[in-house]
Protein backbone atom coordinates (compact mmCIF):
# COMPACT_ATOMS: atom_id res chain seq x y z
CA UNK A 1 0.00 0.00 0.00
CA UNK A 2 1.62 3.23 -1.10
CA UNK A 3 1.66 5.08 2.20
CA UNK A 4 4.13 7.87 2.71
CA UNK A 5 6.73 6.97 5.27
CA UNK A 6 6.33 3.25 4.72
CA UNK A 7 9.41 2.31 2.72
CA UNK A 8 9.23 -1.33 3.71
CA UNK A 9 5.73 -1.70 2.25
CA UNK A 10 5.53 -3.74 -0.95
CA UNK A 11 3.56 -1.24 -2.97
CA UNK A 12 5.22 1.65 -1.24
CA UNK A 13 8.66 0.30 -2.14
CA UNK A 14 7.68 -0.42 -5.71
CA UNK A 15 5.97 2.90 -6.24
CA UNK A 16 8.74 4.85 -4.52
CA UNK A 17 11.14 4.08 -7.37
CA UNK A 18 12.20 7.03 -9.48
CA UNK A 19 9.54 7.81 -12.05
CA UNK A 20 9.40 9.94 -15.13
CA UNK A 21 7.29 13.01 -15.59
CA UNK A 22 3.63 12.79 -16.66
CA UNK A 23 1.97 11.60 -19.85
CA UNK A 24 3.82 11.68 -23.17
CA UNK A 25 6.44 14.22 -22.15
CA UNK A 26 10.19 13.68 -21.87
CA UNK A 27 11.41 13.56 -18.29
CA UNK A 28 12.82 16.81 -17.03
CA UNK A 29 16.53 17.30 -17.72
CA UNK A 30 16.60 14.04 -19.67
CA UNK A 31 16.80 13.16 -23.32
CA UNK A 32 15.08 9.82 -22.88
CA UNK A 33 11.95 8.57 -24.62
CA UNK A 34 8.50 10.00 -24.13
CA UNK A 35 6.54 8.31 -21.37
CA UNK A 36 3.13 6.81 -21.96
CA UNK A 37 1.20 6.34 -18.74
CA UNK A 38 -2.00 4.30 -18.90
CA UNK A 39 -4.30 5.66 -16.24
CA UNK A 40 -6.59 3.21 -14.44
CA UNK A 41 -9.51 5.05 -12.79
CA UNK A 42 -10.27 4.08 -9.21
CA UNK A 43 -13.82 3.17 -10.20
CA UNK A 44 -12.63 0.73 -12.86
CA UNK A 45 -10.10 -0.80 -10.49
CA UNK A 46 -12.80 -1.30 -7.85
CA UNK A 47 -15.19 -2.82 -10.41
CA UNK A 48 -12.57 -5.32 -11.57
CA UNK A 49 -11.84 -6.28 -7.98
CA UNK A 50 -15.53 -6.71 -7.13
CA UNK A 51 -16.20 -8.84 -10.24
CA UNK A 52 -13.28 -11.09 -9.35
CA UNK A 53 -14.42 -11.21 -5.73
CA UNK A 54 -17.94 -12.35 -6.63
CA UNK A 55 -16.75 -14.80 -9.29
CA UNK A 56 -14.19 -16.57 -7.11
CA UNK A 57 -16.53 -16.60 -4.10
CA UNK A 58 -19.06 -18.50 -6.22
CA UNK A 59 -16.38 -21.03 -7.23
CA UNK A 60 -15.34 -21.63 -3.62
CA UNK A 61 -18.98 -21.93 -2.50
CA UNK A 62 -19.86 -24.38 -5.29
CA UNK A 63 -16.90 -26.66 -4.57
CA UNK A 64 -17.58 -26.54 -0.82
CA UNK A 65 -21.25 -27.45 -1.33
CA UNK A 66 -20.88 -30.40 -3.70
CA UNK A 67 -19.19 -33.45 -2.16
CA UNK A 68 -18.53 -34.83 -5.64
CA UNK A 69 -16.12 -31.93 -6.10
CA UNK A 70 -14.07 -32.76 -2.99
CA UNK A 71 -11.34 -34.41 -5.04
CA UNK A 72 -7.66 -33.37 -5.11
CA UNK A 73 -8.06 -31.64 -8.48
CA UNK A 74 -10.96 -29.50 -7.30
CA UNK A 75 -9.19 -28.81 -4.01
CA UNK A 76 -6.41 -27.15 -6.02
CA UNK A 77 -8.97 -25.27 -8.13
CA UNK A 78 -10.73 -24.14 -4.95
CA UNK A 79 -7.47 -22.90 -3.45
CA UNK A 80 -6.63 -21.07 -6.68
CA UNK A 81 -10.02 -19.36 -6.48
CA UNK A 82 -9.37 -18.53 -2.82
CA UNK A 83 -5.98 -17.03 -3.71
CA UNK A 84 -7.55 -14.95 -6.49
CA UNK A 85 -10.27 -13.92 -4.07
CA UNK A 86 -7.64 -12.65 -1.63
CA UNK A 87 -5.92 -10.75 -4.46
CA UNK A 88 -9.24 -9.06 -5.16
CA UNK A 89 -10.00 -8.37 -1.49
CA UNK A 90 -6.59 -6.81 -0.84
CA UNK A 91 -6.76 -4.72 -4.03
CA UNK A 92 -10.29 -3.47 -3.32
CA UNK A 93 -9.48 -2.80 0.33
CA UNK A 94 -6.35 -0.86 -0.52
CA UNK A 95 -8.10 1.27 -3.15
CA UNK A 96 -11.04 1.95 -0.85
CA UNK A 97 -8.78 3.00 2.04
CA UNK A 98 -6.76 5.30 -0.22
CA UNK A 99 -9.96 6.90 -1.55
CA UNK A 100 -11.28 7.44 1.97
CA UNK A 101 -7.98 8.89 3.13
CA UNK A 102 -7.82 11.17 0.11
CA UNK A 103 -11.36 12.40 0.68
CA UNK A 104 -10.70 13.00 4.37
CA UNK A 105 -13.47 10.57 5.32
CA UNK A 106 -11.04 8.32 7.17
CA UNK A 107 -8.89 9.87 9.86
CA UNK A 108 -6.06 7.73 11.16
CA UNK A 109 -2.65 8.14 12.70
CA UNK A 110 0.37 7.61 10.47
CA UNK A 111 1.46 4.54 12.43
CA UNK A 112 -1.99 2.95 12.07
CA UNK A 113 -2.09 3.64 8.34
CA UNK A 114 1.43 2.26 7.96
CA UNK A 115 0.49 -0.90 9.86
CA UNK A 116 -2.64 -1.33 7.75
CA UNK A 117 -0.56 -0.84 4.62
CA UNK A 118 1.92 -3.52 5.68
CA UNK A 119 -0.90 -5.97 6.47
CA UNK A 120 -2.51 -5.38 3.07
CA UNK A 121 0.86 -5.78 1.37
CA UNK A 122 1.51 -9.12 3.07
CA UNK A 123 -2.00 -10.27 2.14
CA UNK A 124 -1.57 -9.16 -1.47
CA UNK A 125 1.91 -10.63 -1.86
CA UNK A 126 1.02 -13.97 -0.23
CA UNK A 127 -2.12 -14.30 -2.36
CA UNK A 128 -0.07 -13.62 -5.51
CA UNK A 129 2.56 -16.20 -4.56
CA UNK A 130 -0.05 -18.81 -3.60
CA UNK A 131 -1.94 -18.17 -6.85
CA UNK A 132 1.22 -18.93 -8.84
CA UNK A 133 1.87 -22.02 -6.70
CA UNK A 134 -1.63 -23.39 -7.29
CA UNK A 135 -1.45 -22.74 -11.04
CA UNK A 136 1.67 -24.93 -11.04
CA UNK A 137 -0.03 -27.52 -8.81
CA UNK A 138 -3.01 -27.75 -11.18
CA UNK A 139 -0.65 -28.27 -14.12
CA UNK A 140 1.18 -31.06 -12.26
CA UNK A 141 -2.12 -32.68 -11.24
CA UNK A 142 -3.32 -32.75 -14.85
CA UNK A 143 0.05 -34.06 -16.02
CA UNK A 144 -0.08 -36.97 -13.56
CA UNK A 145 -3.70 -37.73 -14.51
CA UNK A 146 -2.64 -38.14 -18.17
CA UNK A 147 0.75 -39.85 -17.96
CA UNK A 148 0.07 -41.93 -14.84
CA UNK A 149 -3.66 -42.47 -15.30
CA UNK A 150 -3.76 -45.97 -13.78
CA UNK A 151 -1.81 -44.89 -10.69
CA UNK A 152 -3.31 -41.40 -10.40
CA UNK A 153 -5.56 -42.12 -7.41
CA UNK A 154 -2.72 -43.79 -5.52
CA UNK A 155 -0.27 -40.96 -6.29
CA UNK A 156 -2.56 -37.95 -5.83
CA UNK A 157 -4.52 -38.82 -2.71
CA UNK A 158 -6.71 -36.38 -0.82
CA UNK A 159 -4.37 -36.54 2.18
CA UNK A 160 -1.34 -35.68 0.05
CA UNK A 161 -3.24 -32.90 -1.66
CA UNK A 162 -4.16 -31.41 1.71
CA UNK A 163 -0.55 -31.56 2.89
CA UNK A 164 0.59 -29.92 -0.34
CA UNK A 165 -2.04 -27.19 0.07
CA UNK A 166 -1.00 -26.54 3.67
CA UNK A 167 2.66 -26.37 2.61
CA UNK A 168 1.83 -23.93 -0.21
CA UNK A 169 -0.09 -21.58 2.08
CA UNK A 170 2.66 -21.71 4.71
CA UNK A 171 5.39 -21.07 2.13
CA UNK A 172 3.37 -18.22 0.62
CA UNK A 173 2.86 -16.49 3.96
CA UNK A 174 6.50 -16.94 4.98
CA UNK A 175 7.95 -15.79 1.66
CA UNK A 176 5.64 -12.78 1.43
CA UNK A 177 6.49 -11.72 4.98
CA UNK A 178 10.20 -11.97 4.22
CA UNK A 179 9.72 -10.09 0.97
CA UNK A 180 7.91 -7.23 2.68
CA UNK A 181 10.64 -7.09 5.31
CA UNK A 182 13.44 -7.00 2.73
CA UNK A 183 11.67 -5.45 -0.27
CA UNK A 184 14.34 -2.74 -0.50
CA UNK A 185 16.96 -5.41 -1.27
CA UNK A 186 17.59 -6.35 -4.90
CA UNK A 187 17.92 -10.03 -4.00
CA UNK A 188 14.35 -10.13 -2.68
CA UNK A 189 12.98 -8.72 -5.94
CA UNK A 190 15.03 -11.11 -8.06
CA UNK A 191 13.92 -14.12 -5.98
CA UNK A 192 10.30 -13.26 -6.71
CA UNK A 193 11.06 -12.86 -10.42
CA UNK A 194 12.91 -16.20 -10.54
CA UNK A 195 9.93 -17.86 -8.86
CA UNK A 196 7.59 -16.49 -11.54
CA UNK A 197 9.90 -17.68 -14.33
CA UNK A 198 10.12 -21.12 -12.72
CA UNK A 199 6.32 -21.42 -12.64
CA UNK A 200 6.10 -20.23 -16.25
CA UNK A 201 8.66 -22.79 -17.44
CA UNK A 202 7.02 -25.56 -15.39
CA UNK A 203 3.58 -24.86 -16.83
CA UNK A 204 4.91 -24.53 -20.39
CA UNK A 205 6.85 -27.81 -20.25
CA UNK A 206 3.98 -29.79 -18.68
CA UNK A 207 1.23 -28.46 -20.93
CA UNK A 208 3.30 -28.76 -24.13
CA UNK A 209 4.13 -32.37 -23.23
CA UNK A 210 0.44 -33.05 -22.56
CA UNK A 211 -0.50 -31.50 -25.90
CA UNK A 212 2.00 -33.59 -27.87
CA UNK A 213 0.83 -36.75 -26.11
CA UNK A 214 -2.81 -35.92 -26.83
CA UNK A 215 -2.00 -35.26 -30.50
CA UNK A 216 -0.24 -38.61 -30.81
CA UNK A 217 -3.21 -40.32 -29.15
CA UNK A 218 -5.63 -38.60 -31.54
CA UNK A 219 -3.53 -39.66 -34.53
CA UNK A 220 -3.58 -43.25 -33.32
CA UNK A 221 -7.37 -43.20 -33.02
CA UNK A 222 -7.65 -41.59 -36.44
CA UNK A 223 -5.55 -44.34 -38.02
CA UNK A 224 -7.74 -47.01 -36.42
CA UNK A 225 -10.89 -45.38 -37.80
CA UNK A 226 -9.15 -44.46 -41.09
CA UNK A 227 -9.99 -40.79 -40.73
CA UNK A 228 -8.60 -38.16 -43.02
CA UNK A 229 -5.62 -35.94 -42.25
CA UNK A 230 -7.61 -32.64 -42.03
CA UNK A 231 -9.50 -34.01 -39.03
CA UNK A 232 -6.21 -34.73 -37.23
CA UNK A 233 -4.86 -31.30 -38.08
CA UNK A 234 -8.07 -29.64 -36.87
CA UNK A 235 -7.83 -31.38 -33.51
CA UNK A 236 -4.17 -30.40 -33.19
CA UNK A 237 -4.94 -26.77 -33.96
CA UNK A 238 -7.69 -26.75 -31.35
CA UNK A 239 -5.34 -28.14 -28.72
CA UNK A 240 -2.63 -25.67 -29.67
CA UNK A 241 -5.13 -22.80 -29.46
CA UNK A 242 -6.19 -23.91 -25.97
CA UNK A 243 -2.56 -24.12 -24.87
CA UNK A 244 -1.82 -20.70 -26.36
CA UNK A 245 -4.76 -19.16 -24.50
CA UNK A 246 -3.80 -20.79 -21.20
CA UNK A 247 -0.13 -19.79 -21.28
CA UNK A 248 -0.82 -16.50 -23.04
CA UNK A 249 -3.24 -15.31 -20.37
CA UNK A 250 -0.79 -16.33 -17.66
CA UNK A 251 2.13 -14.49 -19.28
CA UNK A 252 0.22 -11.36 -20.31
CA UNK A 253 -1.42 -10.90 -16.91
CA UNK A 254 1.57 -11.69 -14.70
CA UNK A 255 4.51 -10.82 -16.95
CA UNK A 256 4.30 -6.98 -16.79
CA UNK A 257 4.29 -6.98 -12.97
CA UNK A 258 7.42 -9.12 -12.77
CA UNK A 259 9.05 -7.13 -15.55
CA UNK A 260 8.42 -4.10 -13.34
CA UNK A 261 10.18 -5.79 -10.41
CA UNK A 262 13.08 -6.83 -12.65
CA UNK A 263 13.60 -3.29 -13.91
CA UNK A 264 13.55 -1.92 -10.36
CA UNK A 265 16.45 -4.25 -9.56
CA UNK A 266 18.33 -3.68 -12.84
CA UNK A 267 17.79 -0.08 -13.95
CA UNK A 268 15.96 2.02 -11.33
CA UNK A 269 17.37 5.31 -12.68
CA UNK A 270 17.16 4.71 -16.44
CA UNK A 271 14.66 6.99 -18.28
CA UNK A 272 13.05 4.11 -20.19
CA UNK A 273 12.63 2.06 -17.02
CA UNK A 274 11.19 5.10 -15.27
CA UNK A 275 8.53 5.31 -17.96
CA UNK A 276 7.53 1.70 -17.29
CA UNK A 277 7.38 2.33 -13.54
CA UNK A 278 4.58 4.84 -14.10
CA UNK A 279 2.25 2.03 -15.21
CA UNK A 280 2.47 0.00 -12.00
CA UNK A 281 -1.26 0.39 -11.35
CA UNK A 282 -1.97 -1.04 -14.81
CA UNK A 283 0.16 -4.08 -13.97
CA UNK A 284 -1.82 -4.65 -10.78
CA UNK A 285 -5.06 -4.33 -12.76
CA UNK A 286 -3.83 -7.05 -15.12
CA UNK A 287 -3.29 -9.38 -12.16
CA UNK A 288 -6.84 -8.69 -11.01
CA UNK A 289 -7.99 -9.44 -14.57
CA UNK A 290 -6.17 -12.77 -14.31
CA UNK A 291 -8.18 -13.46 -11.16
CA UNK A 292 -11.31 -12.90 -13.28
CA UNK A 293 -10.14 -15.16 -16.12
CA UNK A 294 -8.87 -18.06 -13.96
CA UNK A 295 -12.37 -19.37 -13.06
CA UNK A 296 -13.31 -19.32 -16.75
CA UNK A 297 -10.29 -21.49 -17.59
CA UNK A 298 -10.05 -23.83 -14.61
CA UNK A 299 -13.52 -23.95 -13.00
CA UNK A 300 -16.47 -23.04 -15.20
CA UNK A 301 -15.53 -25.61 -17.86
CA UNK A 302 -16.65 -28.31 -15.41
CA UNK A 303 -20.29 -29.31 -15.98
CA UNK A 304 -20.59 -30.60 -12.42
CA UNK A 305 -19.37 -27.31 -10.97
CA UNK A 306 -21.62 -25.24 -13.24
CA UNK A 307 -24.60 -27.38 -12.25
CA UNK A 308 -23.86 -26.82 -8.56
CA UNK A 309 -23.40 -23.12 -9.21
CA UNK A 310 -26.81 -22.89 -10.84
CA UNK A 311 -28.36 -24.66 -7.86
CA UNK A 312 -26.70 -22.19 -5.50
CA UNK A 313 -27.95 -19.19 -7.47
CA UNK A 314 -31.49 -20.58 -7.76
CA UNK A 315 -31.56 -21.42 -4.05
CA UNK A 316 -30.41 -17.91 -3.14
CA UNK A 317 -33.37 -16.46 -5.02
UniProtKB/Swiss-Prot annotation:
Compartment(s): Cell membrane
SMART domains recorded: 7TM_GPCR_Srsx
BP terms from Gene Ontology: adenylate cyclase-activating G protein-coupled receptor signaling pathway
A GO CC annotation given for this chain: plasma membrane
InterPro entries on file: GPCR_Rhodpsn, GPCR_Rhodpsn_7TM, Melcrt_ACTH_rcpt, MSH_rcpt
Cytoplasmic side: 64-72, 141-163, 212-240, 301-317
Glycoprotein as UniProt keyword: yes
Bilayer-crossing regions: 38-63, 73-93, 119-140, 164-183, 192-211, 241-266, 280-300
Region (Disordered): 1-26
Extracellular side: 1-37, 94-118, 184-191, 267-279
Membrane topology: Multi-pass membrane protein
Glycosylation sites: 29
Principal location listed in the UniProt entry: membrane
Pfam families in alphabetical order: 7tm_1 (PF00001)
Disulfide pairings: none
Molecular function via GO: melanocyte-stimulating hormone receptor activity
This protein's UniProt keywords: Cell membrane, G-protein coupled receptor, Glycoprotein, Membrane, Receptor, Transducer, Transmembrane, Transmembrane helix
Protein family per UniProt: Belongs to the G-protein coupled receptor 1 family.
Oligomeric form and interacting partners: Interacts with MGRN1, but does not undergo MGRN1-mediated ubiquitination; this interaction competes with GNAS-binding and thus inhibits agonist-induced cAMP production. Interacts with OPN3; the interaction results in a decrease in MC1R-mediated cAMP signaling and ultimately a decrease in melanin production in melanocytes.
Protein task: Receptor for MSH (alpha, beta and gamma) and ACTH. The activity of this receptor is mediated by G proteins which activate adenylate cyclase. Mediates melanogenesis, the production of eumelanin (black/brown) and phaeomelanin (red/yellow), via regulation of cAMP signaling in melanocytes.
Protein's name in the database: Melanocyte-stimulating hormone receptor
Name of the gene: MC1R
Amino acid sequence: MPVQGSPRSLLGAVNSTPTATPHLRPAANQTGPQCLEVSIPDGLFLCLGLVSLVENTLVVAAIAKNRNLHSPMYCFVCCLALSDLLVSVSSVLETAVLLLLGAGALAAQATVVQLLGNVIDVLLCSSMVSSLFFLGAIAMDRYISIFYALRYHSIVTLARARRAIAAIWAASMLSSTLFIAYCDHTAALLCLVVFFLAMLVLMAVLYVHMLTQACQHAQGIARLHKRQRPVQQGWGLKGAATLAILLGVFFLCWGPFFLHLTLIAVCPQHPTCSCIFKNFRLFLALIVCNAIVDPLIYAFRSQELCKTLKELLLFSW
